[in-house]
Regions:
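Residue-level recognition of short, structured coil/turn motifs
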Residues: 25, 75-76, 178
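Membrane-interface aromatic/basic loop that binds lipid-linked glycans or pyrophosphate carriers
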Residues: 101-182
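Short charge-dense sequence patches
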Residues: 7-19, 60, 152-157, 171
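Catalytic core of nucleotide-sugar-dependent glycosyltransferases
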Residues: 32-41, 47-76, 102-121
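Conserved nucleotide-sugar donor-binding catalytic segment
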Residues: 1-50
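All-alpha amphipathic helical-bundle segments outside canonical DNA-binding/catalytic cores
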Residues: 75-85
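Short glycine/serine- and small hydrophobic-enriched flexible loop segments
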Residues: 22, 65-69, 94-98
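Amphipathic alpha-helical repeat scaffolds of TPR domains
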Residues: 83-95
Length: 182
């Protein structure tokens, strides 16, 4: 059943949303941005980690792990491994790849540990995903940072999936200039 995990201090809304989503028959997961989340409120938990990418992403891995554990408890992970893979890319992997290489090593190691033995750690499940999603997850499963060139390729391929070629080129240029969003 649906449980609000009070042990999760950061991202508890995401964990609860996925508890509901995984058990709903009429809800679809989309990666479109539905609202602009304001993270700049002084003293908020999000504000404290805003400029420390590694710490923030390691917290995101904890959020993902809580969702994964909840879905594993009721056997939902096996039926929705592709959704879990997409969510992982949106929540953790894309931003980890922005760190380009060795700086994302701890994050990728944490992701590999979280996925170990899960339904997402499965070639058959990844075959159900878009190739760019499967490639990002497979890179994370290795548990160490990809080379900077591969990071850029994985990001570009994922952007093509989400935004088309033109949108991906715009995001690539923004990433090269150090901007977060286009």
């Amino acid at each position: 059943g649906i449980v609000f995990d009070e042990t999760v201090k950061y991202g508890e809304d995401q964990v609860f949303d996925f508890a509901v989503y995984g058990r709903s028959r009429k809800t679809a997961l989309i990666s479109n941005k539905l609202y602009e989340y304001r993270v700049a409120r002084k003293g908020s938990l999000m504000d404290t980690m805003r400029y420390d990418d590694e710490t923030r992403l390691l917290e995101h891995v904890k959020i993902y792990s809580a969702v994964l554990a909840d879905w594993q408890r009721d056997g939902l992970d096996a039926h929705h491994a592709d959704d879990l893979a997409y969510f992982l890319c949106d929540l953790v992997l894309y931003d980890a790849l922005r760190l380009l290489g060795s700086d994302c090593g701890k994050v990728f190691a944490a992701v590999a540990a979280a996925l170990n033995g899960s339904a997402v750690d499965n070639d058959a499940a990844l075959a159900q995903c878009a190739p760019s999603v499967a490639a990002m997850v497979r890179a994370a499963l290795i548990g160490k940072a990809p080379a900077a060139r591969l990071c850029k390729k994985l990001m570009f391929d994922y952007d093509v999936l989400r935004f088309g070629r033109l949108g991906a080129c715009k995001r690539m240029a923004a990433n090269a200039l150090g901007k977060r969003e286009v």
